[in-house]
Amino acid sequence: MTIVNLAAYHFVSLDANEQWRPLVTARCNELGLRGTILLAPEGINLFIAGTREATDAFIAYIRHDPLFEGKFATLQFKESLSDSQPFRRMLVRLKREIITMKKPAIKPELGRAPFVDARTLKSWLDRGHDDTGRPVVMLDTRNAFEVDVGTFDNALDYRIDKFSEFPEVIDANRADLEGKTVVSFCTGGIRCEKAAIHMKEIGIDNVYQLEGGILKYFEEVGGAHYHGDCFVFDYRTALNPQLQPTENVTCFACRAVVTPEAQRSPSYVAGKSCPACAQAASAA
């Protein structure tokens, strides 16, 4: 059976999440969906999967049901297919933020950060500058272990372990961004959107977010100016620029990404350990 995987997020002020939670949970269970939906005062973030019929019904529900007062009428979904269900259960959770930065929740009504679409970004990278002649710098907002799987050529990577470290590293490295057009990017768009909004709020000029993140870029223009694969937070571990699962796996013990090369190491035992485990053990 073909399973449809949906991912979506939207920054919008919400104040009825406690009332919505049981109703959304019940509807998802009726449709046989699995995955996670996060609701927070700043918006919604979701990863769900099910049959085509079920996911189509969910999209219609979340966009058009009067319960939501049109808050999600423009919610855009990213879709991929798999041969099996990647999630074990259905959860609807209430959170302080839909992506944790440990900063006061943003106010979506004040306006999102400017975005650049995949084709425009590719043309900038082809030329080495934006349409005004300003040099372009790519800023990776993901965690270090994700970056190691793949990233844009010459991207800035501050080796953060969690997204809440982003404001601090930006404050410490503002000089890297001055006089340039900064394009923040992440897997699907949510972190780079919040990162771009934060940079805009602290006075960094000429900041854009990559619309739809790396996965949308792959969908639109392939792997141009990108090396490696894109880590994803499900059983597939990583997708290549053709949006196909790769041979990368996640270590059962330490959750590190294990490349095909690392899987040939004597330290790799499927379901038990990997070279990263061995290195950590030897350093202890």
Swiss-Prot record:
The active site is at C186. Signal peptide: none annotated. CDD domains: RHOD_YceA. It catalyses: uridine(34) in tRNA + AH2 + O2 = 5-hydroxyuridine(34) in tRNA + A + H2O. Residues 132-226 form the Rhodanese domain. It is an enzyme of class 1 (oxidoreductase). InterPro entries: Rhodanese-like_dom, Rhodanese-like_dom_sf, TrhO, TRHO_N. Pfam families: Rhodanese, UPF0176_N. One of its GO terms (molecular function) is oxidoreductase activity, acting on paired donors, with incorporation or reduction of molecular oxygen. Keywords: Oxidoreductase, tRNA processing. GO terms for biological process: tRNA modification. PROSITE patterns: RHODANESE_3 (PS50206). Its EC number is 1.14.-.-. SMART domains: RHOD (SM00450). Belongs to the TrhO family. Catalyzes oxygen-dependent 5-hydroxyuridine (ho5U) modification at position 34 in tRNAs. PANTHER family: RHODANESE-LIKE DOMAIN-CONTAINING PROTEIN 7-RELATED, THIOSULFATE SULFURTRANSFERASE/RHODANESE-LIKE DOMAIN-CONTAINING PROTEIN 2. This is tRNA uridine(34) hydroxylase. It comes from Burkholderia cenocepacia (strain ATCC BAA-245 / DSM 16553 / LMG 16656 / NCTC 13227 / J2315 / CF5610). The gene is trhO.
